[in-house]
Amino acid sequence: MGVHDTAEHPFLVEVKAFIRACVRTETPLLGICLGGQLLAVLLGGRVTANSPCGEKGTMEVTLTSAGKEDPLFAGIPHEFVSFQWHNDSFEIPADATLLASSSACAGQAFRFGAMAWGTQFHPEVDRAIVDCWARWEEETAPHATRFLADFVLAEQPYLEVSRRMLGNFLGLAGFDTDNGTEKRP
């Protein structure tokens, strides 16, 4: 599924409207993979289908200088393990700030304004998801065992970074990350 596949996936029209509203009202938004691609294209960036920057598997991501200072990545090492599963890739929109890159894909994360972030990598996966995705696609199914083994080897640092990043986002969105409740003034 890609950013322009609204005929095949009509719900994307509503998702795009939701993203536009979040950006307009500065409602905290974290777009992951397709979500980051949708955010990028709605902000004037370009998304390349079947990009040479497509990545699948467990890979290193490097924060830029701006990424090291961004509150989404507070407490996260300059280089960290990520999980990638994308054929398409986004170009950072003109008014956005590049936060992270990888050796294969210059745009791994960006921020627009104070409350909208897009990532190409997946901070939300676990072993079951990695195994499912690897077996799901004809291209990757013969290598599913390797994808899962690579993820398991990197799982501990991956989980530490993912939990920190997602916790940072929830805190920025106004949730008390100690007990999962919304902060009240």
Segments the model singles out, each with a brief description of its role:
Residues 1-30:
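Flexible gly/pro-rich beta->alpha loop and the following alpha-helix that scaffold active-site loops
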Residues 7-11, 94, 129:
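Residues at alpha-helix caps and immediate loop-helix transition turns in enzyme cores, especially N-
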Residues 11-15, 47-48, 101, 135-137:
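Glycine-rich, phosphate-binding/catalytic loops in enzymes
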Residues 125-185:
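Acyltransferase
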